[in-house]
């Protein structure tokens, strides 16, 4: 199984959108059993909050299903050992990510 984790600042917009877009692609290709896809934040600001209304609206516009129970979580050091791919949404998140996970990233 390929495990993918998308990372942004708050885990309510970009990383969440990337998570649901990739899940939709994988579902349409009938490959759900081959992937585990999630998203997380580098900050604690939005922890526990749901997906941003703008993100929900855009995903709805392009008919991408959203798990409305999704809540923002923060990446942990342990995630580095769980996921095959950790994808930061921009340079700032990559920099912050390097403070959280091991040196060899």
Residue map of PLM features:
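Glycine/proline-rich loop-helix segments at beta-alpha junctions forming the active-site rim
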Residues: 60, 74-105
């Amino acid at each position: 199984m390929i495990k993918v984790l998308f990372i942004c600042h708050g885990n309510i917009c970009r990383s969440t959108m990337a998570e649901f877009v990739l899940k939709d692609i994988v579902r349409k290709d009938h490959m759900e059993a081959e992937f585990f896809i999630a998203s997380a934040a580098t900050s604690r600001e939005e922890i526990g909050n749901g997906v941003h209304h703008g993100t929900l609206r855009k995903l709805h516009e392009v008919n991408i299903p959203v798990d409305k129970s999704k809540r923002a979580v923060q990446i942990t050091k342990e995630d580095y050992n769980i996921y095959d791919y950790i994808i930061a949404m921009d340079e700032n998140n990559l920099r912050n990510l390097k403070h959280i996970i091991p040196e060899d990233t």
